[in-house]
Regions:
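Metallo-beta-lactamase
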Residues: 1-93, 188-199
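Short, polar loop motifs at secondary-structure junctions
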Residues: 50, 131-137, 150-152
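Active-site metal-binding loops of divalent metal-dependent hydrolases
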Residues: 67-69, 105, 167-169, 199-201
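Active-site-proximal loop/helix segments of hydrolase catalytic cores
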Residues: 113, 171-208
């Protein structure tokens, strides 16, 4: 608490740097590669799309973490934190997604419009892998292909094992649901590659 108060005092006294007016330069994604990189000949690849949204291609699958493609991370479209940078890959430019890994329910990691668009992708929606307590939230919003995990539980998907691992964080989407659902990171084990996605976390003994 003392550190937080000191940081707030320093911010009030010294001010905070303003975000850049112009977008930060980006490296355009190789969209033909992303779409062709699938199946037995797939090369392990990770593409950072923005914030916590990452396209991970491994084990012949396309996995997407914490998808947020909306302009704001908020329960409403006209107010709330606004993204400073467009997504590096547009939602409509993504290759077919096999699974979506959601680390927790904060608005900057769980964006309903993005999830609904992914669930409606041509050829069938992906599997949504979520922490304990979140599956019902998805089902009540029309997204039925969902599995929820406790810490250290895993689910197999076409030869790839997806495990929810602990993180030092919390959950809430409103005033009355704080800590009502779990949060975490993901460890993904494929024959050709292993991936760790932390979600949101502070440093804790979970990393020991």
């Amino acid at each position: 608490l003392a550190d937080v108060l000191r940081w707030r005092w320093q911010a009030a006294r010294q001010g905070l740097p303003r975000p850049p007016v112009e977008p930060i330069p980006t490296q355009p994604a190789d969209l033909p590669f992303l779409h062709a990189n699938r199946g037995p000949a797939q090369q392990p690849a990770v593409t950072w799309i923005g914030h916590a949204t990452v396209l991970a291609q491994l084990g012949g699958l396309n996995l997407l973490t914490d998808p947020i493609f909306s302009t704001r991370a908020s329960p409403v479209s006209f107010a709330g934190p606004r993204r400073a940078q467009p997504p590096g890959v547009a939602l409509t430019e993504l290759p077919p997604i096999d699974a979506v890994l959601v680390s927790h329910n904060h608005y900057d990691h769980l964006d309903l419009p993005s999830c609904r668009a992914l669930a409606a992708q041509p050829g069938g929606g992906p599997l949504f892998v979520v922490p304990l307590g979140l599956a019902d939230w998805f089902r009540r919003r029309g997204i039925a292909r969902v599995v929820e995990l406790d810490w250290w539980q895993h689910t197999p998907l076409d030869g790839v094992e997806i495990t929810l691992v602990p993180a030092q964080h919390w959950s809430a989407r409103g005033l009355n649901d704080r800590l009502k659902t779990l949060w975490g990171g993901f460890a993904v084990f494929a024959p050709d590659c292993q991936l760790f996605f932390a979600g949101d976390t502070g440093y804790s003994r979970d990393f020991a």
